[in-house]
Amino acid sequence: MKPQQLATQKFSEHYGYSAAQTVFAPGRVNIIGEHTDYNDGFVMPCAINYGMAVSFSKRDDSVWRVYAIDIDEQDEFDLSRPIEPSEHKWANYVRGVVKYIQEKCPEFKQGADLAMTSDVPMSSGLSSSAALEISIGKTAQVLGDLPLSLAEIALIGQQAENKFVGANCGNMDQLTSALGQKDQVIMIDCRSLEITPTPVPHGYSIAIINSNVKHDLVTGEYNSRRQECEFAAKFFGVKALRDVTPAQFIERAAELQAENELAYKRAKHIISENQRVLEAVEALQAKDMVKLGQLMAGSHDSMRDDFEITIPEIDYLVELAQVAIGKNGGARMTGGGFGGCIVCLVPDEKVEHLRRIIADNYEKQTGIKETFHLCTACDGVHLI
């Protein structure tokens, strides 16, 4: 059963009446451009056909009752009182979004009953948290008929995750969940929020292979990577690493390396990765899948060697996928790192070959069974 149907059904069972409306917000996969978003750089993700559905109805008071179907837990809070953190981690994503919506729209106090469910695998690097934030943001916007654009809802989601949940994420995940387009990857300039849609080439599929090694950004190494990037930006005297050209980096690389080896390696990844994203857009537009595959491979190598966020299981998955796909297409780790998924752009006629190569080898080598998802690029958050 799809999340949209499950949310509607479980809402009725839980609350004893039918939901008025349902919102769906997709997860995302990032084709190329990793950890560049919080460096004001470029990313090239697409929204995917897995996501979070929220069924909801207005109440005649200011209380939100939120039923999390997948874990059978409920949270309740009053919009007419200051919103405090909950002991349930999932509930803080909801509370955080509502809190920061109220900062922008102080008159918003509309109560509601909500039931939500997701088919985005948790801790997979496919943005289950952004899908949750954007679905809640859109729900609040509809409930209060609030004058918020989709980009504003995305930035509120990011704010909630940064300040209320405590994960120092960039804005890519939320922007993609809010602004995704059917059959398109979207290059996002994470500073200007300008979007360049580019069609997924005909005859190619997006395969996502989950290593089933879980990652946890809040307690992981994500925040230290961010600090190392900020150190490097300060070294170059710029607002963010996006402002450093490859030539400027080369000029002072030895000096930075002598001062802070880790900051040097992190900056090397970010600056080269921004360049790869810009070249990837050109490659896609030219339907040059050999070039795109090379850029994806370069991105993975840089994440492994310079940003140091891959793990052996992920590196092995990427090696298997690259062998199976060949030159026309590519594979790389996607998401924050330390587990999660790889993304592949694969010719349709090689999808089953890829699936078989992975199935025959990955579990044998690692002792972990992978999960294989074929995805389509889809629209961002919408009412159903």
Swiss-Prot record:
Catalytic residues (UniProt): 173 (proton acceptor)
Residues annotated as binding Mg(2+): 129, 161
Gene Ontology MF annotations: ATP binding; galactokinase activity; magnesium ion binding
Top-rank lineage group of the source organism: Bacteria
Matching InterPro entries: Galactokinase, Galactokinase_bac, Galactokinase_CS, GalKase_N, GHMP_kinase_C_dom, GHMP_kinase_C_sf, GHMP_kinase_N_dom, GHMP_knse_ATP-bd_CS
SUPFAM superfamilies per the UniProt record, alphabetical: GHMP Kinase, C-terminal domain (SSF55060), Ribosomal protein S5 domain 2-like (SSF54211)
Record-level GO BP terms: galactose metabolic process
Site positions for Transition state stabilizer: 28
Swiss-Prot/TrEMBL catalytic activity: alpha-D-galactose + ATP = alpha-D-galactose 1-phosphate + ADP + H(+)
First-level EC class: transferase
Pathway(s) this gene product operates in, as recorded in its UniProt entry: Carbohydrate metabolism; galactose metabolism
Residues noted as binding substrate in the record, renumbered to the chain: 34-37, 222
Name assigned to this protein: Galactokinase
Gene: galK
